[in-house]
A protein has these predicted regions:
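Multi-bladed beta-propeller domains
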Residues: 1-17, 51, 80-105, 130-134, ...
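Residue-level detector of Asp-centered blade-edge/turn motifs that repeat once per structural unit
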Residues: 25-26, 113-114, 165-167, 213-214, ...
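Residue position within the beta-strands of beta-propeller blades
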Residues: 29-33, 117-121, 169-174, 217-221, ...
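Predominantly five- to eight-bladed beta-propeller fold
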Residues: 35-83, 87-93, 121-139, 287-298, ...
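N-terminal cap/lid segment of alpha/beta-hydrolase-fold proteins
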Residues: 78-80, 294-334
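Short beta-strand element of the alpha/beta-hydrolase
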Residues: 327, 335-345
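The serine-hydrolase catalytic nucleophile loop
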Residues: 336, 347-361, 376, 518-519
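Active-site-proximal cap/loop segments of hydrolase catalytic domains
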Residues: 360, 365, 373-567
Length: 567
C-alpha cells in the first residue's frame, strides 16, 4: 500500500526478503531462532526406560514461566546459510534464552551493518539466579572467530532492543535498577567504544524506537498523560551538545508503534478507546496524521460510540491525578447510570487510550455503565516519581487514589451512587480484593480477574521473583524488613477478609503462573464460606490472559451477566 493510502497489493517473497532485517547485509545468512534441548529435567529424559513418564525433576527455580513448565529446552539463535541450508547455533549447549522468555521475538537479535557480527539479548543466568534478576545483556557474536563479547556488562538491569543506524551506531534500551522491571527505560547509543544516554535528563520512559534515515535522530513512543505519543531525540555524536527530547504528536489516542520512516513521514499504528488499531502516516513537518487503513470503518458506522472524557482529580495528598471517564452512547446527563471503577493491572502499566478485546470500555459503556479509569500512583506517563510511587506501597496511596477518583466522579448528578462496582485484573484484581475489605460500603459488586488475594502465597508461587522482591520489598520471612512486612500484612488483601460483605465474581486461569491458581481459589473459597454471593469463572487452559476466542466470549457473557444480576 502506498504511504499516501489507497488499495493493498500483494508483494512477492523476493520483495519480502529485501525488507527482512534477519537477512544478513550480503544475503548469505538468515537469522532465526528455535528451541534446543539442553538439560534433562523430564522423567522420560532422565530415565530412558520410562518413556511414558510425565514427571519433572527440578533442583532450582525457573522451573516454570508464564504458562509453561521448563522442559529443559531453551530458545537459541541460529544463522542459516541461504544456499546450503546449514544452521549454526551461536550459543550451543547454553541454558539461556534468546529470544527472552516468555514474550521475546526477533527484536532480541540483529546484524551489524557489515554483517560481521550478530548482536543478541540474553540473561545468562540459570535457575534461581535467573528468577531473581532482570540483568539481561547485549552480546556481540563474531562470525569469523565465533567469539562472544558482553557489551553491557556494567549495567545490572535490563538491556534490550538493539538496533543499528545505517552509519553503524548501536542504540538500545536500558533500565539501571537491578530487579526493577518497570524502571525508567532510556535510549543508549554505543559507538566507537563510547556509550551515551540520550534520555537521562528527560522525565519519562521509552516504549520502542526507530532510527531516523539521517542517522542523527531517533523517533520513539512513550506514555504521557494517559496516552502514548511520538517523540524525537537527537544524537549529538562526538559533540558535547546535550541530547534534546521533543514531543512530536499530541491527542487523545495511543501511537502503539513506529513501523517505518519514508519521505518525511512516519508510518505508525494508532488506536484509542473507541477504535482498534489502524495504520496512519505522520507528517514530520506539519505534525499531522493521515489514516491509511480503515479496516473497521464499516462496523463503526453502525455503532453509537461512547464519549471519553479526561478529568483531573485532586488526591487526598494534594496531587493532580488524570482520570478517564467513559460515558455511555447517547448519554443523558439528566439520567442516573450505574458506574464501574476500573482498576488497571501492572501495577506499572499505562492506563492510556488502549483498545482491548476483553477489558473493552466501549462494550461496558454500551451496556449502560459509566467507567471511571484512574491513572493512579504507579502508572508511567506522569513522571518517574509517580511511576515509582507504588513499589512497596501497594495498599497505600494507590488504593486511596482509587477511592478519591470514585468519590470525586460520584458527585456528578448522573452517577447512581447506590450502584457502584469495582472491576480489574492482575494488580487490578489485587485492588478489587483489597477494596472488598476496605471500601466502607461504597460498592455493590466486585469482579477480580487473576488478582493477588494473598501476597504471602504470591511470593511463594509466582515465577518472576525479581518482581515481588522489588514491589513487595523482599521476602516474607525477613522480619527486619519493614517494607516487606507491611506488604505481607497491612497491604495483604487476605488480612481484611473478615470485612467482606459484598457480592464478588472471581476469574482464574489454570495456567496462570504469574498470579497462580491458589489466589483465585482462595478468594472464592473465603467468599463462599462467609456466605457471600460469589461466582468462580475457572479457565483451566488459559494463562494470565484469555486467548481462546470462545473462552473470551464466555468471559464477556459472565461479566455482564454478573453486573446485571448484582448491580
Amino acid at each position: 500500500m502506498s504511504v499516501s493510502g489507497g488499495n493493498f497489493t500483494e508483494i512477492s517473497k523476493d520483495e519480502a526478503k529485501v525488507a527482512d532485517k534477519n537477512l544478513s547485509p550480503n544475503g548469505q545468512y538468515l537469522l532465526m531462532n528455535k528451541p534446543v534441548h539442553v538439560k534433562d529435567v523430564a522423567g522420560k529424559d532422565i530415565y530412558k526406560d520410562l518413556p511414558k513418564s510425565d514427571a519433572y525433576v527440578y533442583t532450582s527455580l525457573d522451573y516454570r514461566h508464564w504458562d509453561k513448565y521448563n522442559d529443559g529446552s531453551y530458545n537459541h539463535v541460529f544463522y542459516k546459510d541461504t544456499k546450503t541450508g546449514a544452521e549454526i547455533d551461536i550459543t550451543p549447549g547454553q541454558p539461556y534464552y534468546t529470544p527472552q522468555a516468555p514474550f521475546g521475538g526477533d527484536e532480541d537479535y540483529v546484524w551489524d551493518p557489515k554483517g560481521e557480527n550478530i548482536y543478541y539479548v540474553s540473561k545468562k543466568l540459570a535457575g534461581t539466579e535467573y528468577a531473581v534478576s532482570t540483568n539481561t545483556d547485549i552480546y556481540k557474536f563474531n562470525l569469523a572467530d565465533k567469539k562472544t563479547e558482553n557489551i553491557t556488562e556494567e549495567n545490572k538491569g535490563y538491556d534490550t532492543q538493539p538496533a543499528f543506524s545505517k552509519a553503524g551506531a548501536l542504540a538500545y534500551l536500558q533500565m539501571k535498577t537491578p530487579g526493577y522491571e518497570a524502571d525508567k527505560n532510556d535510549i543508549i547509543i554505543f559507538e566507537n567504544g563510547v556509550k551515551q544516554n540520550l534520555t537521562s535528563q528527560w522525565d519519562g520512559t521509552v516504549n520502542g524506537f526507530l532510527w531516523a534515515s539521517n542517522n542523527k535522530d531517533i523517533y520513539f513512543t512513550a506514555p504521557v498523560d494517559g496516552t502514548q505519543q511520538i517523540f524525537k531525540v537527537d544524537y549529538p555524536g562526538k559533540t558535547r551538545k546535550m541530547a534534546v527530547v521533543e514531543q512530536l504528536s499530541q491527542g487523545q489516542f495511543d501511537v502503539t508503534g513506529i513501523v517505518a520512516e519514508n519521505n518525511g513521514q512516519l508510518i505508525v499504528t494508532r488506536t484509542d478507546m473507541n477504535h482498534a488499531s489502524e495504520i496512519f502516516s505522520f507528517d514530520l513537518k506539519s505534525k499531522t496524521f493521515k489514516q491509511l487503513t480503515q479496516v473497521n470503518n464499516e462496523f463503526y458506522g453502525k455503532l453509537d460510540l461512547p464519549t471519553v472524557e479526561k478529568r483531573m482529580v485532586t488526591t487526598k495528598d494534594g496531587k493532580q491525578m488524570l482520570v478517564w471517564v467513559i460515558l455511555p452512547p447517547n448519554f443523558d446527563k439528566n439520567k442516573k447510570y450505574p458506574t464501574l471503577l476500573y482498576a488497571q493491572g501492572g501495577p506499572q502499566s499505562a492506563l492510556s487510550q488502549f483498545y482491548s478485546t476483553r477489558w473493552n470500555f466501549q462494550l461496558m459503556a454500551s451496556e449502560g455503565y459509566i467507567i471511571v479509569a484512574p491513572n493512579r500512583r504507579g502508572m508511567p506517563g506522569h513522571g518517574v516519581e509517580w511511576n515509582a510511587d507504588i513499589s512497596g506501597d501497594w495498599g497505600g496511596k494507590a488504593m486511596q487514589d482509587y477511592l478519591d477518583a470514585i468519590d470525586a466522579i460520584s458527585k456528578e448528578a448522573y452517577v447512581d451512587k447506590d450502584r457502584l462496582g469495582a472491576i480489574g485484573a492482575s494488580f487490578g484484581g489485587y485492588s478489587v480484593f483489597w477494596l472488598a475489605g476496605n471500601h466502607d460500603g461504597r460498592f455493590k459488586t466486585f469482579i477480580a480477574h487473576d488478582g493477588v488475594f494473598d501476597t504471602r502465597a504470591m511470593y511463594g508461587t509466582t515465577e518472576e521473583l525479581f518482581f515481588v522482591n522489588h514491589d513487595m520489598g523482599g521476602a516474607y520471612w525477613d522480619k527486619n524488613n519493614a517494607t516487606a512486612q507491611k506488604s505481607f500484612k497491612e497491604f495483604n488483601p487476605i488480612t481484611y477478609v473478615d470485612k467482606w460483605d459484598t457480592p464478588i465474581m472471581i476469574v482464574q486461569g489454570g495456567k496462570d503462573y504469574r498470579v497462580p491458581i491458589e489466589q483465585g481459589l482462595g478468594a472464592f473459597q473465603a467468599a463462599q464460606l462467609k456466605g457471600i454471593k460469589s461466582k468462580l469463572l475457572y479457565l483451566p487452559e488459559e494463562n494470565h490472559w484469555v486467548l481462546q476466542p470462545q473462552n473470551a466470549l464466555v468471559w464477556q457473557r459472565e461479566f455482564f451477566s454478573w453486573l446485571k444480576e448484582t448491580l
